[in-house]
Design a protein with these regions (language model features):
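Bacterial N-terminal signal peptides that target proteins for export
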Residues: 2-14
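Short aromatic-cysteine micro-motif
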Residues: 37, 42-46, 50-90, 94-97, ...
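Bacterial N-terminal signal peptides
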Residues: 12-22
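Boundary at the C-terminal end of the N-terminal hydrophobic targeting segment
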Residues: 27-29
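Bulky hydrophobic/aromatic "packing anchor" residues in well-ordered structure
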Residues: 45-48, 124-125, 160
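Short, structured beta-strand segments at or near domain termini in extracellular proteins/domains
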Residues: 151-164
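An exposed tryptophan-centered "aromatic clamp" motif
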Residues: 75-88, 94-143, 149, 163
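Short, small/polar residue-rich loop motifs at catalytic or cofactor-binding pockets
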Residues: 33-35
Length: 164
């Protein structure tokens, strides 16, 4: 008799975990609203460009080739975004960029419904690594991890954000 009770308890536990997990994902997704070329993050009160720098929002997706930029080149990209899109675009901080990481996503650790065609590579943040000031923090969308080991002359991808 005990043999049959263990699988039933395990099945109940699995069902509860699945419900909790699906509710967590729905809560996470409900914090974001898509608006074409940008995504509103209600939790952080910021707006993300849907596409990485170099790509354009066209045909309801990000098209083109994303650009890897050295840190010095980012200021020009921000100036162009401000001129073309209006607002005060900037690099996200580490916490903001980590917030759009999707640990449960398979290939690219980001919700591709919100951010289509995102490269599964590192993206710049605006933060210097305080322990090693010659290095900047990045967030890697292949692993979903944050790394503070990139010097400014190594090119990485860029996704811009602005305050709401």
């Amino acid at each position: 008799m005990l043999f049959f009770k263990i699988p039933l308890i395990s099945v109940k536990a699995i069902i509860i975990l699945l419900l909790i997990h699906s509710n967590f994902n729905n809560v996470w997704a409900s914090n974001f609203i898509t608006r074409g070329h940008y995504v509103i993050d209600l939790g952080q009160k910021i707006e993300w460009l849907t596409c990485p720098v170099g790509m354009v929002w066209q045909n309801k997706t990000c098209e083109g080739t994303p650009l890897k930029l050295k840190f010095k080149q980012i200021e020009l990209a921000i100036d162009q975004a401000n001129d073309q899109l209006g607002g005060k675009w900037r690099l996200p901080n580490r916490k903001e960029l980590e917030r759009i990481v999707c640990k449960s996503c398979a290939a690219v650790k980001i919700d591709t419904k919100l951010f289509p065609n995102t490269p599964a590579e590192s993206f710049w943040t605006n933060e210097i690594n305080a322990w090693q000031p010659k290095f900047m923090w990045t967030v890697n969308f292949f692993t979903g991890h944050t790394f503070g080991r990139f010097p400014e002359f190594i090119p990485n991808y860029v996704r811009l954000v602005r305050d709401r």
